[in-house]
Design a protein with these regions (language model features):
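Short, mixed charged/polar active-site loops
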Residues: 100-102, 125
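Predominantly a Rossmann-like dinucleotide-binding segment in NAD(P)-dependent oxidoreductases
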Residues: 1-83, 189
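Short, flexible loop/turn elements at secondary-structure junctions
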Residues: 10, 65-68, 95-97, 107, ...
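Residue-level marker for the onset of beta-strands and adjacent loop->beta junctions
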Residues: 87-89, 105, 115
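C-terminal helical cap and adjacent loop that interface with cofactors, partners, or active-site loops
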Residues: 42, 47, 112-221
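Short glycine/serine/proline-enriched coil/turn segments at secondary-structure junctions
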Residues: 14-17, 109-112, 127
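Active-site beta-strand termini and strand-to-loop segments that position acidic
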Residues: 86, 91-97, 121
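Structured core elements
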Residues: 92, 102-104, 118
Length: 221
């Protein structure tokens, strides 16, 4: 099959955390900028799945946002009136090869934390977070994911080589950092550097994922 659509997001109500950032920088940045100002959380996995910069490239973008309904309430708590970032921002991207990416940003509504990692293909679908589920074209139900037994079998068959190292996974869980994810990412970075391998993401990836912040603002305005 062929992957045709991916999704990712940063949806995380930050009400408990606004005051924890030095000099209130995160509130200030949201207050002063429209667009998806934190696209990389979702863009990384979405672009990797579609081989962006490794066979395909992003070509066109359109973004929309809601008004800052809760954002302005947040500003009022700080004794201010202006707040530019919309409560919810959605971005659609089309690639050179006719694939699409959807990215969302939302840090002020009561919606529960969600990274919306989804991969859609011609012969299957995977939903990774917050609820893991898969569907495949063989014996397709159309209204439900595959059974837990088949899901576990698929996860075992396609398990990433890094996570096959049991001791590494256990160390990651013990050290922590976003459930061990931070440790795995640091481990992979150092492994590549030690072994002379190209990094999993390069400066071109970082630049293009990050530029969505400004491009989405331009699209919206």
């Amino acid at each position: 099959g062929e992957i045709i659509h991916t999704e990712g997001a940063y949806i995380h109500n930050l009400d408990p955390f606004w005051n924890e950032y030095q000099d209130n920088w995160r509130y200030e940045f949201n207050k002063k900028h429209r667009g998806d100002i934190y696209p990389t959380h979702g863009m990384g996995p979405a672009c990797w799945a579609l081989d962006i910069h490794r066979g395909d490239r992003m070509k066109t973008l359109i973004a929309m946002d809601t008004d800052a309904f809760n954002g302005k309430k947040l500003a009022q708590k700080h004794g201010e009136e202006s707040y530019l970032n919309g409560d919810h921002t959605t971005t659609l991207i089309r690639t050179e090869k006719g694939k699409t990416i959807e990215i969302q940003h939302n840090v002020v509504t009561p919606r529960p934390y969600n990274r919306m990692y989804q991969v859609e293909g011609t012969e299957g679908f995977a939903n990774k977070y917050p609820n893991e589920g898969f569907s495949i074209i063989e014996n397709l139900d159309g209204e439900a994911y595959v059974s837990s037994e088949m899901r576990d079998a698929l996860m075992a068959e396609y398990q990433h080589p890094i996570t096959r190292e049991g001791s590494l996974v256990e160390t990651a869980r013990r050290v922590g950092g976003h459930g061990g994810m931070d440790f795995i990412m640091d481990y992979r970075l150092i492994y590549c550097l030690r072994n002379g391998l190209p990094l999993d993401q390069d400066v071109y990836d970082a630049a293009e994922w990050s530029c969505l912040g400004e491009l989405t603002r331009v699209s919206i305005e």
